[in-house]
Regions:
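Preference for short coil/turn "hinge" residues that link or interrupt alpha-helices
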Residues: 6, 54, 76-79
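Short, acidic/turn-prone active-site loops that include or flank metal/cofactor-
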Residues: 14, 33-36, 57, 108, ...
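Active-site neighborhoods of divalent-metal-dependent phosphate/nucleic-acid chemistry enzymes
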Residues: 12, 18, 61-123
């Protein structure tokens, strides 16, 4: 499974991504409530309500609790790493969602995902 972060969706909305489309067709994409919220704060494609409804209908990643996220930050020394609450939540969710990789276009988030062994490389698929 692949958890696509907000940057992947925004890029796809601007220009269709064939890798994302193939993963969607094969039911291999997970979504996360915080990604949907971030997209809702922006300008998802029209019709807006239909796009958000579609995203909510995708398989959802397991969501780490605030306590789990705090423990995850300390265990992996993610403090002062340049990432925020959504980023660490996506990292933690990728780890607790079985066989899940995180796909991001955010260089800092990808840098943090690599040593955790959860970075998705679309060029390999």
């Amino acid at each position: 499974m692949v958890l696509a972060d907000t940057s992947v969706w925004v890029a796809h909305f601007r220009k269709a991504n064939p890798v994302l489309e193939a993963l969607l067709l094969n039911d291999q994409i997970l979504c996360h409530p915080l990604v949907i919220i971030e997209l809702a704060c922006g300008s998802p494609p029209s019709p807006r309500a239909k796009t958000l409804f579609y995203l909510k209908g995708l398989q959802q990643a397991k969501v780490a609790t605030p306590s789990e996220i705090l423990e995850f930050i300390e265990k992996n020394k993610l403090f002062d790493s340049g990432c925020g609450a959504v980023d660490v939540s996506l990292l933690a969710s990728s780890l607790i969602s079985e066989n899940t990789l995180l796909w991001t276009l955010d260089k800092q988030l990808e840098y943090l995902a690599l040593p955790l062994g959860i970075s998705f490389n679309p060029q390999l698929h």
